[in-house]
């Protein structure tokens, strides 16, 4: 009854199996992909009927990690998985981006892809496995799809490209690049790098695309053996008569509208033209569908913009193809933040802040691959007012999470190591205006805010978004694209880096036929734009501030004997808790004896350091200490001499004369000098008052007040 069909092949250093026909047989297609014990189960369901009024392609990708895959039970209150985490959202986007452009234009049937991680080898990241699974399931489904695609991760270790490096290998890699494409074209690139050159990055993209052909070949072979019959789907025929009528009414007017450089004014004019043309046509013929008219108007807009660019005319806002919009760069714009910057590029603007915290502010991330601590956080917020809209506001959406991660990748390569700068750093980018490439504005703003905060980044970084318009062999690469150029163009190509090299590269291509030559032109043109932006940023701030903000916590580091850690912490944390309350500081202790004291007030930090030094100081025999009586017993008194250490003053060591009753000479809380006579093998301390006060008479203590009966 169950007849699994399996393809098994070698993929770099790993063995991959793709199996179908065993599970989820009511789904349109389902596969289990296994790469060296990391297994992802992927299903595809496509609806045969289009919903009434549907005017966009409803593709949904869900990626979910099950903790049982790693042999664990969820730590949440209900002990089950909840909403997708940030990592799962990013992988879902990674799967979606190369697949979406491969569905034919006009295909509006709902498609849902669900990828579930069911087994995980900590050395093999499930993201590539999930991408392969989604491609295979679509190839088997019969749904109209111009795939399959492959997927590969590329590392760069010892000046060599490495295919699908393990988690341990990635720790030593200067590159983490994911590339996906069809047999003939690259469609998607996502990467972070340690300031590599344009040539090294391009080489990695080509290497990854070449290597993933084995995946595409095996998916094609599996589809030939087990694939379902192709859907009998043809696109709706173009209503040429309606197209001509719309063009007659709107084409020249849209051309004039797209010469308006100011975004909101242009949008208002375009919307007015669309409304007038739609109303006029519906008045002439009530049987026409409004959605069809809008679709034709959209294609006319696209043709107007693209034809001008290809013919060498100025762009929508009057710029040449390689020009960057006007820049305005300011730092220190907010009085109480630790670092701030306002970065404006044309009609795109980001208000970016940097906040410094201690190690306990770091984010602990519990992932399927294991727990890790993140000391650098970058959050991106895109409120609706940034584009003049009144939309919903709430928790970050997929787009905001993805843009924030891209901006973080752009800055990560220049961040200082923990031993150089022991702070947790949080950067927040508030997009206050948007007309193209707000994520790259966030990179520029983050670099400026970090320098304003006194974070010793290795170099300033900037980001730029490139676009492409291509018809046949004719192509034009555009620098610093507008939102419209992104929407109407064939490629969105974002590059971030310093003067030395690239720190992040993201590429989304909507068409096939992007050659190595085109990517080379785009990278070189992006380098020129990046260097221009960096030169303008340098006029605002050249190097990181010499000192951190007066409002930021200052972290002072001292080293103690690891054997003394227990003394500083105390029983149940009593000593360290009392210390933090007494000094108003934050104290963190590492296993090697490193103690970090954070305080906004230098005097408080000094007080905390002196108290810790007292606690951890070695008691020296023969030395005199200031002490305080803590307990009185028949045979003497216990005296605290600092650092939580206590010693016994025997009754014979209180005074030069015979002492009959200890309470006649000492009271609890009384301060007195004591001399250390001996420390025995068990660490017990023997003290003497009479030797510490030799030559000074020890007076009897005043009688304790009698309680009234």
Curated annotation (Swiss-Prot):
GO CC field: cytosol
Family matches, as Pfam families: KH_1, PNPase, RNase_PH, RNase_PH_C, S1
Known cofactor(s): Mg(2+)
Record: residues binding Mg(2+): 486, 492
Keywords: Cytoplasm, Magnesium, Metal-binding, Nucleotidyltransferase, RNA-binding, Stress response, Transferase
EC number(s) reported in the record: 2.7.7.8
Family statement drawn from the similarity comment of this UniProt entry: Belongs to the polyribonucleotide nucleotidyltransferase family.
Subunit structure: Component of the RNA degradosome, which is a multiprotein complex involved in RNA processing and mRNA degradation.
Function of the molecule: Involved in mRNA degradation. Catalyzes the phosphorolysis of single-stranded polyribonucleotides processively in the 3'- to 5'-direction.
Name of this chain's protein: Polyribonucleotide nucleotidyltransferase
Organism from which the protein derives: Photorhabdus luminescens
Gene giving rise to this polypeptide: pnp
């Amino acid at each position: 009854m169950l007849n699994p069909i399996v393809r098994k092949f070698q993929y770099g250093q790993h063995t991959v199996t793709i199996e179908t026909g065993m599970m989820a047989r009511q789904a349109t297609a389902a596969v289990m992909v296994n790469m060296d014990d990391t297994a992802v189960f992927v299903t595809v369901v496509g609806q045969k009927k289009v919903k009434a009024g549907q005017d966009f392609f409803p593709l949904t990708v869900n990626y979910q990690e099950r903790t049982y895959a790693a042999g664990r039970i969820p730590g949440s209150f209900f002990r089950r998985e909840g909403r997708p985490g940030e990592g799962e959202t990013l992988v879902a986007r990674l799967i979606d981006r190369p697949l979406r452009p491969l569905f034919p234009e006009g295909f509006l049937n709902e498609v849902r892809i669900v990828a579930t991680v069911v087994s995980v080898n900590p050395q093999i990241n499930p993201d590539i496995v999930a991408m392969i699974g989604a491609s295979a399931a679509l190839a088997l489904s019969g749904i109209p799809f111009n795939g399959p695609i492959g997927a590969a991760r590329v590392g760069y270790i010892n000046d060599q490209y490495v295919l699908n490096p393990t988690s341990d290998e990635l720790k030593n890699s200067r590159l983490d690049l994911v590339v996906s494409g069809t047999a003939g074209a690259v469609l998607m690139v996502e990467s972070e790098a340690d300031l590599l050159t344009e040539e090294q990055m391009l080489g990695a993209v080509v290497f990854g695309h070449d290597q993933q052909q084995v995946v595409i070949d095996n998916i094609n072979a599996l589809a030939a053996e087990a694939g379902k019959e192709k859907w009998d789907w043809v696109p709706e025929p173009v209503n040429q008569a309606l197209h001509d009528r719309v063009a007659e009414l709107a084409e020249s007017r849209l051309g004039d509208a797209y010469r308006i450089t100011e975004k909101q004014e242009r949008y208002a004019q375009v919307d007015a033209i669309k409304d007038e043309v739609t109303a006029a046509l519906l008045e002439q013929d009530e049987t026409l569908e409004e959605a069809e008219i809008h679709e034709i108007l959209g294609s006319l807009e696209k043709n107007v913009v693209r034809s001008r660019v290809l013919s060498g005319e100025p762009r929508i806002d009057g710029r040449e193809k390689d020009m960057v919009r006007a820049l305005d760069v300011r730092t220190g714009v907010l009085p109480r933040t630790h670092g701030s910057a306002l970065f404006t590029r044309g009609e795109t603007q980001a208000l970016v802040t940097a906040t410094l915290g201690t190690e306990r502010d770091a984010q602990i991330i519990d992932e399927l691959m294991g727990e890790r601590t993140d000391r650098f956080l970058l959050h991106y917020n895109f409120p609706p007012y940034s584009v003049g809209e009144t939309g919903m506001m709430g928790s970050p959406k997929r787009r905001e999470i993805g843009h924030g991660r891209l901006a973080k990748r752009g800055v990560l390569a220049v961040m200082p190591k923990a031993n150089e700068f022991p702070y947790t750093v949080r950067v927040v980018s508030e997009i206050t205006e948007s007309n193209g490439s707000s994520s790259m504005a966030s990179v520029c703003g983050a670099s400026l805010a970090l320098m304003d905060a006194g974070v010793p980044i290795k170099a300033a970084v900037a980001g730029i978004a490139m676009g492409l318009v291509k018809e046949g062999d004719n192509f034009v690469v555009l620098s610093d694209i507008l939102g419209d150029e992104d929407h109407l163009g064939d490629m969105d190509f974002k590059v971030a880096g310093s003067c030395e090299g690239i720190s992040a590269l993201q590429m989304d291509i909507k068409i096939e036929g992007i050659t190595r030559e085109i990517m080379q032109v785009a990278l070189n043109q992006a380098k020129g734009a990046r260097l221009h932006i960096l030169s303008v940023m340098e006029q605002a701030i050249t190097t990181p501030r010499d000192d951190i903000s007066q409002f930021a916590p200052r972290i002072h580091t001292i080293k103690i004997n690891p054997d003394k850690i227990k003394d500083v912490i105390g029983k149940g944390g009593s000593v360290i808790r009392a210390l933090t309350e007494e000094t108003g500081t934050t104290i963190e202790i590492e296993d090697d004896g490193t103690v970090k004291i954070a305080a906004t007030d230098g005097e408080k930090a000094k007080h905390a350091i002196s108290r810790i030094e007292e606690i951890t100081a070695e008691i020296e025999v023969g030395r005199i200490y200031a002490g305080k009586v803590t307990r009185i017993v028949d045979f003497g008194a216990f005296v605290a001499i600092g650092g939580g250490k206590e010693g016994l003053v025997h009754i014979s060591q209180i005074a030069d004369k015979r002492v009959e009753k200890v309470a006649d000479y000492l009271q609890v809380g009384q301060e007195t000098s004591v001399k250390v006579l001996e420390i025995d093998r068990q660490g017990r301390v023997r003290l003497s008052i009479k030797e510490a006060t030799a030559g000074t008479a020890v007076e009897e203590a005043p009688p304790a007040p009698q309680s009234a009966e």
